[in-house]
Design a protein with these regions (language model features):
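Hydrophobic h-region of N-terminal signal peptides that target proteins for export
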Residues: 10-18
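Subset of outer-membrane beta-barrel
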Residues: 19-307
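Short non-domain terminal segments
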Residues: 5, 14-15, 274
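Sec-dependent signal peptide recognition
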Residues: 2-9
C-alpha cells in the first residue's frame, strides 16, 4: 500500500512539475489568495500547520486531527483597489466517522460604472464583478499519524452580464505527524478540475501541487518557536518557495513572520494572534500584513470560534 501511494505521488509530481510555465493561462485567480491571517503572516507556509476550519483551504486532511468538536472561521482580506476577499468555513469532528467541513470564499469588487466608446463617462448603469467558491470536505485518520482528506468545490465567476462561468474542482491532501519535536509533513493537489470559457478563449483552473513541513526549533514549557517551509508548483508559473516562523507565548500570544521566494511580487509578511476564552468558549483572533513590492501591502483579519 505504501509503495503504491509513493508511486502515485511520484507520477503526480512528475506530471505537475514538468508543465511549462504559462502565465495568464488560468482563470479563477482568487483561488490563490491566502484566506487565513495566521497563514498569510507566515507567507502562506501553512500546509503542515493548518488546523480547524482554516485547514479546508490549506490542507483538508488536517481537520481529521481536530481536538474540538466544531470550529468556525471568519476571515477577510483587504485586497488591492478596494477589492474584498472573504472566507467563512466550518469544520466538524464526527469521531470514528471522520471529519466534515464546508467553506465559502468570495471576491467582490466595488460598484463600477458601465462605460462604452460612445459614453466613456458612463451609461448610468453600474455592475459588480465577483468570484465565488463553495466547498464540501471530508477527512479521516488512517493511522494515529496519517490523515487523508479531500474537498469538492463549485466555482462561479461573474464578470459582467453574459460573462459568467461555472466550474468544479477537486482537492486531495495527506498529512503525516512524525511525533518528534512537533515535526509534520503534508502535501496537496489543489484546484484540479474543469476549465472555463470567456469569449473564444478557454482557461484552466489554477491547479497546483504543494508540499510542506514544519517543526519546533525551540520549546520550553508553553513557549514554542515553530518554523515551516513549503513549495508550491502552479500550472501557470515557476515554483514558489515559502518559509514562516511563529513564536507562541503560553499558547495565548502568537508572533509570526515569513518570506516568499520566487514570487513575482510577494516578499515579506508579518502578523500577530491572540487566543482567549469568552463566555466559556475558546476563541482566537489574528491579523496579518503582506508586502507585494510596487503593488503595496494587503492586510487580513479573522476570528475563530471553538466548541
Amino acid at each position: 500500500m505504501l509503495k503504491k501511494s509513493l508511486l502515485i505521488t511520484g507520477l503526480i509530481n512528475t506530471l505537475i512539475f514538468s508543465q511549462y510555465e504559462r502565465p495568464g493561462s488560468t482563470a479563477a485567480q482568487f483561488l490563490k489568495i491566502d484566506v487565513s491571517p495566521a497563514a498569510a503572516a507566515m507567507a502562506g507556509s501553512y500546509i503542515s500547520i493548518a488546523t480547524g476550519a482554516d485547514a479546508l483551504y490549506y490542507n483538508p486532511a488536517a481537520i481529521a486531527s481536530m481536538s474540538q468538536k466544531f470550529n468556525l472561521s471568519f476571515n477577510q482580506t483587504n485586497w488591492f483597489a478596494g477589492i474584498k476577499h472573504d472566507y467563512s468555513a466550518i469544520a466538524f469532528n464526527a469521531g470514528r466517522a471522520g471529519s466534515f467541513g464546508a467553506l465559502l470564499t468570495r471576491l467582490v469588487t466595488d460598484e463600477m460604472k458601465v462605460r462604452t466608446p460612445m459614453q466613456p463617462d458612463g451609461t448610468g448603469e453600474t455592475f459588480y464583478a465577483g468570484s465565488y467558491r463553495i466547498g464540501l470536505a471530508y477527512a479521516r485518520k488512517m493511522t494515529d499519524r496519517v490523515n487523508f482528506g479531500g474537498t469538492i468545490n463549485y466555482i462561479f465567476i461573474s464578470l459582467f452580464r453574459e460573462f459568467k462561468q461555472e466550474a468544479t474542482t477537486l482537492e486531495l491532501s495527506a498529512s503525516y505527524d512524525v511525533g518528534v519535536r512537533g515535526m509534520k509533513f503534508a502535501m496537496k493537489i489543489g484546484n484540479f478540475g474543469s476549465s472555463v470559457k470567456f469569449v473564444n478563449e478557454i482557461y484552466e483552473m489554477p491547479t497546483n501541487f504543494s508540499f510542506g513541513f514544519s517543526g519546533n526549533l525551540f520549546s520550553r514549557g508553553a513557549n514554542i518557536v515553530l518554523a515551516s517551509g513549503s513549495i508550491i508548483k502552479p500550472n501557470d508559473g515557476p515554483p514558489i518557495g515559502l518559509t514562516g516562523f511563529e513564536y507562541s507565548m503560553n499558547q495565548m500570544v502568537f508572533l509570526r513572520g515569513g518570506y516568499n521566494f520566487g514570487h513575482s511580487t510577494a516578499t515579506w509578511s508579518t502578523g500577530v494572534g491572540l487566543k482567549f476564552k469568552l463566555a466559556g468558549r475558546q476563541m482566537s483572533t489574528d491579523y496579518s500584513m503582506n508586502d507585494f513590492s510596487a503593488l503595496g501591502t494587503t492586510s487580513r483579519y479573522g476570528i475563530n470560534l471553538h466548541f
